[in-house]
From Swiss-Prot:
Residues 186-191 are annotated as: Nuclear localization signal. Pfam families: Hormone_recep, Nuc_recep-AF1, zf-C4. The lineage of its organism: Eukaryota, Metazoa, Chordata, Craniata, Vertebrata. Residues 232-256 are annotated as: Disordered. The gene is rxra. There is a cross-link at residue 134 (Glycyl lysine isopeptide (Lys-Gly) (interchain with G-Cter in SUMO)). Zn(2+) 1 binds at residues 161, 164, 178, 181. This is Retinoic acid receptor RXR-alpha. Residues 473-484 are annotated as: AF-2.
Amino acid sequence: MSSAAMDTKHFLPLGGRTCADTLRCTTSWTAGYDFSSQVNSSSLSSSGLRGSMTAPLLHPSLGNSGLNNSLGSPTQLPSPLSSPINGMGPPFSVISPPLGPSMAIPSTPGLGYGTGSPQIHSPMNSVSSTEDIKPPPGINGILKVPMHPSGAMASFTKHICAICGDRSSGKHYGVYSCEGCKGFFKRTVRKDLTYTCRDSKDCMIDKRQRNRCQYCRYQKCLAMGMKREAVQEERQRGKERNENEVESSNSANEDMPVEKILEAEHAVEPKTETYTEANMGLAPNSPSDPVTNICQAADKQLFTLVEWAKRIPHFSELPLDDQVILLRAGWNELLIASFSHRSIAVKDGILLATGLHVHRNSAHSAGVGAIFDRVLTELVSKMRDMQMDKTELGCLRAIVLFNPDSKGLSNPLEVEALREKVYASLEAYCKQKYPEQPGRFAKLLLRLPALRSIGLKCLEHLFFFKLIGDTPIDTFLMEMLEAPHQMT
């Protein structure tokens, strides 16, 4: 007699019949069947087996043919018995011993098991049949419900290192492996290292002992299928990527050469290096109006600003009306950037193009202290801290100049393309000149919002009062742009 039939004395009577009577009808297919081969580890979880399942009624009136029919077509089942123990009710009829798990026969193919494969089911953790089938918590994403009994092992092996058994981080060089074995194999191949074994070349390689013998570890890497050529191909791809980056940088510099931008800065640079305390003009307690002096210096700088713009690559190729629009939109920011960078060596003040030094106290006395302090803290101080050079200043000013959002442009996309070229050239310059400062390019760009905000505030407070007198700015700029380009 089978072990299943011998345990019938533990079963409770159902409907006037003993469960032993019910079980006898299944003897023909349960005898000699190894249930353990079909037990899914996820069904033993405390959360129970989730999902929608149907099972045939185990009833004495069903012979073997009745059982087979019920397995093939659940709709032909007699009225099932509802078990208060497992709470499932229809479409389940469960044989429930007082101790241990109950047994149900699912007929739903969605579980991934063959029809009629028995399952172990926890009677105290049943769920609604309308829920989706999910793996129990704790193994979700690691072990999946297999399509066949051996699927659990096939899925599990993808998540362990084939060399040492540690947790795999993915497929590396053809084999699922951990980061440690991946790095070990890559170093060995790239450096062309050779190892020797102190024992008999059959050392145990596992998670704890993988570092004891490098020879055996490397041999196991090869034996499990790691490919040396995969490492070499990876290195070649990295080399090609670096070459492409260099070519891209060179291409960007050819379109918008930073050397030309630097030449433009030097060409319009005022000769203020020889000023002394005597000719600074505005001492801290000077009665002179600092706003008037700033406006006079800005008026002078407008001439050189047009000259500077003409020297920026591709600016003169734009339509004349667009050139006027761009200068009109950015002149205040362009001048502020210039005198801010010129004032890096000055303490608590700014140095104008005329050689005059405006102290912070004078600005506060004139009622423009708030905006003056913003210039010192958000521009001058930041430029000083990062030691911004002339090339970087010129590129930032070129970015301000090529503003595609300026109203009235005939071709904003062309202006935007020129700005993108300046971005690319500046980034390539930072990488080449300051390789130890990977965030320098971003730091430079972060000065632009502050420059924009300060420029707008300066206009609001008439910081450049009477900048060009009674001459309309459009007419003034138009005359300057139509003048021949004086190369000095």
